[in-house]
Amino acid sequence: MAWSAQQYLKFEDERTRPARDLLAQVPLERVLNGYDLGCGPGNSTELLTDRYGVNVITGIDSDDDMLEKAADRLPNTNFGKADLATWKPAQKADLLYANAVFQWVPDHLAVLSQLMDQLESGGVLAVQMPDNLQEPTHIAMHETADGGPWKDAFSGGGLRRKPLPPPSDYFNALSPKSSRVDVWHTVYNHPMKDADSIVEWVKGTGLRPYLAAAGEENREAFLADYTRRIAAAYPPMADGRLLLRFPRLFVVAVKK
């Protein structure tokens, strides 16, 4: 499934804030060989190049549109296409940084453990993932998928992202190879204009596979049903806006 950089960047500031918060906890003053894994359109890569330099960071993604936008944004930075489930750097890295990508990678705990082997001693693995499958945005996706004439397209259940493991699983997986592991949650509260704005947000990520599965002929009806559910799930605040609650999980591990 292809992604849309343009749709993703409609909420660039909000999407980049967790990337900044993740980078703020990376205890490296200098990086000689760093990677932005799942770099998307380059908004997170730009944070890394601003801090460490354009020549020491490489962006990695699996989507052509995202890589094209990233290269346009940062023409002096290297980008490459790869599947993160099997990717390895050509040589050991100082920094493996991943903002909002490993929630899509099957068995990502094992992948993260393997990536620790690709770090120099003192190198850092820094990961952030949405932990929002129990939020109304995602519950409504499942309800909409199961409730319309398109439901047969979802009968296999393969689109439903698996919940993230508990924090203790990340400690258990990474601690044997780390001198330090930090795991924490942050809940972001984003004021949104209306239900349509929330739908536009999730159209850039979580809702996209559902729309693709429903088919072009059902797209507008699926969106209308989903938007109705979102409007019912998010009551307006005093000023009429809706508050989008968005939990995220952060992991920072320093290699022994």
Swiss-Prot record:
Keywords for this protein: Cytoplasm, Methyltransferase, S-adenosyl-L-methionine, Transferase
Presence of keyword Transferase: yes
CDD domains cross-referenced by the UniProt entry: AdoMet_MTases (cd02440)
GO molecular function: trans-aconitate 2-methyltransferase activity
Major localisation: cytoplasm
InterPro entries: SAM-dependent_MTases_sf (IPR029063), Trans-aconitate_MeTrfase (IPR023506), Trans_acon_MeTrfase_C (IPR023149)
UniProt subcellular location: Cytoplasm
GO CC terms in record: cytoplasm
Its EC number(s): 2.1.1.144
Catalytic activity of the protein: trans-aconitate + S-adenosyl-L-methionine = (E)-3-(methoxycarbonyl)pent-2-enedioate + S-adenosyl-L-homocysteine
GO annotation (BP), single: methylation
Database matches in Gene3D superfamilies: S-adenosyl-L-methionine-dependent methyltransferases, Vaccinia Virus protein VP39
Described function: Catalyzes the S-adenosylmethionine monomethyl esterification of trans-aconitate.
Family indicated by similarity: Belongs to the methyltransferase superfamily. Tam family.
Protein name in the entry: Trans-aconitate 2-methyltransferase
Species this protein is from: Agrobacterium fabrum (strain C58 / ATCC 33970)
Organism lineage string: Bacteria, Pseudomonadati, Pseudomonadota, Alphaproteobacteria, Hyphomicrobiales
